[in-house]
Amino acid sequence: MISRVTEALSKVKGSMGSHERHALPGVIGDDLLRFGKLPLCLFICIILTAVTVVTTAHHTRLLTAQREQLVLERDALDIEWRNLILEENALGDHSRVERIATEKLQMQHVDPSQENIVVQK
C-alpha cells in the first residue's frame, strides 16, 4: 500500500515538472487494470447476481399469476362438471323418462298377456 502511494507521488512530482497531458479515462483504466482487478471482478459478479435475482423474481411472479389463473379455471371446470352430473341425474330419472314416454311418444305399458317373445336361432 505504501509503495503504491510513493509510486503515485513520484508520478505526480515527475508530471509537475513536465507539461504532459494525460487522458483521464486512460489513467483510470490503467489503474483499474493494474491495481483493481479484484474489485472489478467483484463488481461484475455483483451486477450479474443482481440481474439474475431480478430475472428470477420476474419469472416467479409470472408463474404465480399463471398458477392462479389455472386454479380459477380448474374451479370453473369443477363447477361445470358438478352441474353436468346433476343434469345427468335429473335427465336419467326413471319417472321423468316414463312421463315423457307416455305424454310425448304415446307409449303404454304392455300387459304380460299381450307380450310376444321372439326367439332367434
From Swiss-Prot:
<keyword id="KW-0812">Transmembrane</keyword>
<keyword id="KW-0131">Cell cycle</keyword>
<keyword id="KW-1003">Cell membrane</keyword>
<keyword id="KW-0997">Cell inner membrane</keyword>
<feature type="short sequence motif" description="Leucine zipper-like">
    <location>
        <begin position="58"/>
        <end position="85"/>
    </location>
</feature>
<keyword id="KW-0472">Membrane</keyword>
<comment type="function">
    <text>Essential cell division protein. May link together the upstream cell division proteins, which are predominantly cytoplasmic, with the downstream cell division proteins, which are predominantly periplasmic. Can also mediate Zn(2+)-sensitivity probably by increasing the permeability of the inner membrane.</text>
</comment>
<feature type="transmembrane region" description="Helical">
    <location>
        <begin position="35"/>
        <end position="57"/>
    </location>
</feature>
<dbReference type="GO" id="GO:1990587">
    <property type="term" value="C:FtsQBL complex"/>
</dbReference>
<keyword id="KW-0132">Cell division</keyword>
<feature type="topological domain" description="Cytoplasmic">
    <location>
        <begin position="1"/>
        <end position="34"/>
    </location>
</feature>
<dbReference type="GO" id="GO:0051301">
    <property type="term" value="P:cell division"/>
</dbReference>
<dbReference type="GO" id="GO:0005886">
    <property type="term" value="C:plasma membrane"/>
</dbReference>
<feature type="topological domain" description="Periplasmic">
    <location>
        <begin position="58"/>
        <end position="121"/>
    </location>
</feature>
<dbReference type="GO" id="GO:1990588">
    <property type="term" value="C:FtsBL complex"/>
</dbReference>
<dbReference type="GO" id="GO:0043093">
    <property type="term" value="P:FtsZ-dependent cytokinesis"/>
</dbReference>
<dbReference type="InterPro" id="IPR011922">
    <property type="entry name" value="Cell_div_FtsL"/>
</dbReference>
<comment type="subunit">
    <text>Part of a complex composed of FtsB, FtsL and FtsQ. The complex can be formed before its localization to the division site. This tripartite complex can be divided further into a subcomplex of FtsB and FtsL, which forms in the absence of FtsQ. Also interacts with FtsI, FtsN and YmgF. Homodimer in vitro. May form multimers.</text>
</comment>
<dbReference type="GO" id="GO:0032153">
    <property type="term" value="C:cell division site"/>
</dbReference>
<feature type="coiled-coil region">
    <location>
        <begin position="63"/>
        <end position="91"/>
    </location>
</feature>
<keyword id="KW-1133">Transmembrane helix</keyword>
<dbReference type="Pfam" id="PF04999">
    <property type="entry name" value="FtsL"/>
</dbReference>
<protein>
    <recommendedName>
        <fullName>Cell division protein FtsL</fullName>
    </recommendedName>
</protein>
<dbReference type="GO" id="GO:0000917">
    <property type="term" value="P:division septum assembly"/>
</dbReference>
<comment type="similarity">
    <text>Belongs to the FtsL family.</text>
</comment>
<dbReference type="GO" id="GO:1990586">
    <property type="term" value="C:divisome complex"/>
</dbReference>
<keyword id="KW-0175">Coiled coil</keyword>
